[in-house]
Every structure is written in structure tokens, then in C-alpha cells.
């Protein structure tokens, strides 16, 4: 996303322009939970359409939140991973998950173990061990 596509110079608006759609942080969550391929992410419970997933992966890559490498045995297979920039989204995810767990606990049970793991990993070194 180039600077000309941002709505304003507001930090919140710019952040939402980059990761504020309903899929980007779920992709980041999946990568933090250990998913690495398009297929693994496509099979997530939320059911993202393949065209949307491809678009979000491209956008996250353009914005240097994720990167990828090709499998040695099959150039069509890409393994995605979080960059340093992507790893820093950890705190945003943690706070959104805490908020949801507090106010909508019945909707927050699927990833409670992940939330607990994130809550206990507070240093950057520890965050990398989550991935």
C-alpha cells in the first residue's frame, strides 16, 4: 500500500488501512499459531475465501508484515512467516483477545490456549518462540 492510498496521516487510520480488514489479523494469528501454507490458512475455522486469502497475503507481504519462501521440492508451495513488523502485532492481538474474552467469553474459547501462551510471552525473544 503506497502512501497515496492511506486515508489520512492519522496513525490509527493508517494502521487500519493496513491491517483493519476482517482477515489480516486472523492470518497473522494463524502464522503465530504455526500455520505456514496457503492451504493451512484456508482451512481455518473462519472460512476465508481463496481469492480473499490470496489478496490479504499479497497485501501483508507488500507491507512487510509477512514474507515467504518457496518449498525446495515444489516451487508452487510457499511457506509464509511473520517478519519483525508482523511479530510486533502480537500486542494488538493479545489486547483484542483479552477484550473479547472479558466481554464475550462464550465467543472467545477457540483460541484460549493461544491467548494464555501470548499472555505469558512478554519479551520479543519469547514472542518469536510462539511462532
Describe every region a protein language model picked out.
Residues 39-40, 58, 78:
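Residues within the helices of the helix-turn-helix
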Amino acid at each position: 500500500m503506497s502512501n497515496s492510498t492511506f486515508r489520512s496521516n492519522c496513525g490509527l487510520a493508517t494502521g487500519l488501512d493496513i491491517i483493519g480488514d476482517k482477515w489480516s489479523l486472523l492470518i497473522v494469528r494463524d502464522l503465530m499459531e504455526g500455520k505456514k501454507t496457503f492451504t493451512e490458512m484456508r482451512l481455518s475455522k473462519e472460512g476465508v475465501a481463496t481469492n480473499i486469502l490470496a489478496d490479504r497475503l499479497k497485501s501483508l507481504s507488500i507491507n512487510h508484515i509477512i514474507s515467504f519462501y518457496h518449498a525446495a521440492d515444489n516451487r508452487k508451495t510457499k511457506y509464509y512467516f511473520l517478519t519483525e513488523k508482523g511479530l510486533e502485532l502480537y500486542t494488538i492481538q493479545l489486547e483484542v483477545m483479552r477484550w473479547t474474552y472479558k466481554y464475550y467469553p462464550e465467543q472467545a474459547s477457540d483460541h484460549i490456549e493461544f491467548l494464555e501462551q501470548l499472555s505469558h510471552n512478554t519479551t520479543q525473544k519469547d514472542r518469536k518462540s510462539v511462532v
